[in-house]
């Protein structure tokens, strides 16, 4: 594994832990050259799953897109990277259990919103505003009112 700081190829594993659901391994590594530490994640490569976009286009499932969306929604919120990784792992596992070959982007978005709503309401509203394409203040108010009623 190449060091992200000095680009050295040689590093040693300092600590390894399974994710909460066992779908990935988190490894702390130390670079042999610069001695800085960094984290890597290892997971099993799964069978191909296609995502059907709103316009009907199909593209390969990319868990990084889900993680990036969750990370943007959780920016400056008390949600750790490990929690975000666990959310993505949970979503990916559910998708692979429910769908064999293809899944709609709408189904993925709903799963993300469900998990964010349970974890952090501000992150949920942030994600929903982009996912549901809020165009005015009333859209935000309606979503917040729905959260208050739960």
Curated annotation (Swiss-Prot):
The keyword Transcription is annotated on this UniProt entry: yes
Q: Which UniProt keywords apply?
A: ATP-binding, DNA-binding, Metal-binding, Nucleotide-binding, Repressor, Transcription, Transcription regulation, Zinc, Zinc-finger
Q: Name one GO biological process term.
A: negative regulation of DNA-templated transcription
Zinc fingers classed as unnamed: ranges: 3-34
Query: One Pfam family for this entry, by name?
Result: Zn_ribbon_NrdR
Which residue intervals define the domain ATP-cone in the entry? 49-139
The coenzyme or cofactor needed here is:
Zn(2+)
Q: How is the cofactor bound?
A: Binds 1 zinc ion.
> Which Gene Ontology terms cover its molecular function?
ATP binding; DNA binding; zinc ion binding
The UniProt entry, under PANTHER family, shows: TRANSCRIPTIONAL REPRESSOR NRDR
- Protein family per UniProt: Belongs to the NrdR family.
What is the protein's known function?
A: Negatively regulates transcription of bacterial ribonucleotide reductase nrd genes and operons by binding to NrdR-boxes.
The protein's matches in NCBIfam families, at most eight in alphabetical order, are given as: transcriptional regulator NrdR
Q: What is the name of the protein in this document?
A: Transcriptional repressor NrdR
Q: Origin organism of this chain?
A: Syntrophomonas wolfei subsp. wolfei (strain DSM 2245B / Goettingen)
């Amino acid at each position: 594994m190449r060091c992200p700081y000095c680009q050295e190829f040689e590093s040693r594993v300092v600590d390894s832990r399974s994710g909460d659901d066992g779908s990935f391994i988190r490894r702390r590594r130390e670079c042999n050259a610069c001695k800085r530490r960094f984290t890597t994640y290892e997971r099993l490569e799964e069978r191909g799953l296609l995502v059907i976009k709103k316009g009907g286009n199909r593209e390969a499932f990319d868990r990084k897109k889900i993680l990036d969306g969750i990370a943007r929604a959780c920016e400056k919120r008390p949600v750790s990277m490990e929690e975000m990784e666990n959310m993505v792992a949970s979503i990916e596992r559910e998708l692979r259990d429910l769908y064999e070959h293809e899944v709609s982007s709408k189904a993925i978005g709903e799963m993300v919103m469900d998990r964010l709503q349970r974890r952090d309401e501000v992150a949920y509203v942030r994600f929903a505003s982009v996912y549901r394409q809020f165009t005015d203040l009333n859209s935000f108010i309606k979503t917040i009112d729905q959260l208050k009623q739960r």
